[in-house]
Amino acid sequence: MNIVILAAGTGKRMRSALPKVLHPLAGRPLLAHVIDTARTLNPTRLVVVVGHGADQVRTAVAASDVQFALQEQQLGTGHAVQQALPLLDPSAPTLVLYGDVPLTKASTLKRLTDAAGHDGYGVLTVTLDDPTGYGRIVRDAQGKVERIVEQKDATAEQQKIAEINTGIVVMPTKRLDGWLSSLKNENAQGEFYLTDVVELAIEAGIEVVTAQPDEEWETLGVNSKQQLAELERIHQRNVADDLLVAGVTIADPARIDVRGTLECGRDVSIDVNCVFEGKVTLGDNVSIGPNCVIRNATIGAGTRIDAYTHIEGAQVGAQAVLGPYARLRPGATLSDETHIGNFVEVKNAVLGHGSKANHLSYIGDSDVGARVNIGAGTITCNYDGANKFRTIIEDDVFVGSDTQLVAPVRVGRGVTIAAGTTVWKDVEEGLLVLNEKTQIGKTGYVRPTKKKS
């Protein structure tokens, strides 16, 4: 089967310089969702018709199995499909999809193609309470499809018809060249409508069959930012429902966003307003507090993530505790039973089993052993303005509060670092290290007071 995806439109109502089909839904371009669905049908040819912003669209969805046809002037859907003809296999049927209709299920498309067969003509239709703005399916007295009439060309009687054309059709490719060449643009838009091919098919003795989707939202398109937002919420609720069915506890299914893939073990719980991006894997019994953002990360079983924690490109072991207000940046690798507390940032660093940094610290470009305690206000000074260096902290080290470790530096096993120490030289294992300072107490000091106005 050939699949042609129409993606050449300007999308004026989006009021954006970005081509309409590249606006994101769940973190990915609208067109990418359509291509993914098309791939599940195993097409022999997959062609995207581009026009407005053609170079941007090509770059965004380029792949070895995707070919592109250029529609230099947007002269209608029939003209768009005509541009793809040289790339199609004439011996296979052609399914036409739209780059701004991202939620159609593969099962719905399969139902349509099965109904049409190899040489038939199939139209995906839907019945709406308010069909205003859509092309109507006109049937004869026996219920057979006669033609499709666009809203602007429909009579008052035809505008009462509730069954509408979604635009998604499957057609015998070997007949398309003749049909498309016969189209006329004698309509209110002055365009070559793909819908007019229906009458040509009927004239050729081909019965036009129809199929309908399971859900009305499968055929909704995007023409404005409002419609994009509506489809985003539909998609996210569908994702949330799938997670609930799989056994995930979600505090409010209307307040979760998955912009990629989220894999969950058993008894995972997710509080409100959490965002998951890229590929995220949550082990059994993971608990996530409200307002967390997790991107491209793996979280081990039994780990608790408290509110407002941000995690990106990190690996977290089992039974860890993160947050609230913790930040794991790319390259952070935490072993089992580690604790990263409030206002602690970890970047490109490894923390061993049971190590803790509970308050107000920065751990960057570091290798931290097991059972290390990092006191509040500890900073690994990893950057000299031009280069970054690593800090090595071996097992069982106690780092006092307000410590600065100036990399490159190594702290040996079992070292105790006193509060307020700056460590700029390697420390042998087992030592107490401190910077000697004299504490002075002065008498006679008068604290300034505010003047009353």
From Swiss-Prot:
Residues annotated for Mg(2+) binding in this entry: D100, N223
Annotated region (Linker), positions in chain: 226-246
Gene label: glmU
Record field: catalytic activity: alpha-D-glucosamine 1-phosphate + acetyl-CoA = N-acetyl-alpha-D-glucosamine 1-phosphate + CoA + H(+); N-acetyl-alpha-D-glucosamine 1-phosphate + UTP + H(+) = UDP-N-acetyl-alpha-D-glucosamine + diphosphate
Residue numbers binding acetyl-CoA: A376, N382, Y383, S401, A419
UniProt keyword terms in alphabetical order: Acyltransferase, Cell shape, Cell wall biogenesis/degradation, Cytoplasm, Magnesium, Metal-binding, Multifunctional enzyme, Nucleotidyltransferase, Peptidoglycan synthesis, Repeat, Transferase
GO cellular component: cytoplasm; membrane
Enzyme Commission code: 2.7.7.23, 2.3.1.157
Active site annotation, chain numbering: H359 (proton acceptor)
Entry's localization field: Cytoplasm
GO MF term set: glucosamine-1-phosphate N-acetyltransferase activity; magnesium ion binding; UDP-N-acetylglucosamine diphosphorylase activity
Region Pyrophosphorylase, annotated ranges: 1-225
Main location, first listed in the record: cytoplasm
NCBIfam families: glmU (TIGR01173)
Protein's name according to its UniProt entry: Bifunctional protein GlmU
Annotated GO biological process: cell morphogenesis; cell wall organization; lipid A biosynthetic process; peptidoglycan biosynthetic process; regulation of cell shape; UDP-N-acetylglucosamine biosynthetic process
Pathway stated in the Swiss-Prot or TrEMBL entry: Nucleotide-sugar biosynthesis; UDP-N-acetyl-alpha-D-glucosamine biosynthesis; N-acetyl-alpha-D-glucosamine 1-phosphate from alpha-D-glucosamine 6-phosphate (route II): step 2/2; Nucleotide-sugar biosynthesis; UDP-N-acetyl-alpha-D-glucosamine biosynthesis; UDP-N-acetyl-alpha-D-glucosamine from N-acetyl-alpha-D-glucosamine 1-phosphate: step 1/1; Bacterial outer membrane biogenesis; LPS lipid A biosynthesis
Top-rank taxon: Bacteria
Region of interest (N-acetyltransferase), ranges: 247-453
Function: Catalyzes the last two sequential reactions in the de novo biosynthetic pathway for UDP-N-acetylglucosamine (UDP-GlcNAc). The C-terminal domain catalyzes the transfer of acetyl group from acetyl coenzyme A to glucosamine-1-phosphate (GlcN-1-P) to produce N-acetylglucosamine-1-phosphate (GlcNAc-1-P), which is converted into UDP-GlcNAc by the transfer of uridine 5-monophosphate (from uridine 5-triphosphate), a reaction catalyzed by the N-terminal domain.
Name of one Pfam family that matches: Hexapep
Family, as annotated: In the N-terminal section; belongs to the N-acetylglucosamine-1-phosphate uridyltransferase family. In the C-terminal section; belongs to the transferase hexapeptide repeat family.
Cofactor note: Binds 1 Mg(2+) ion per subunit.
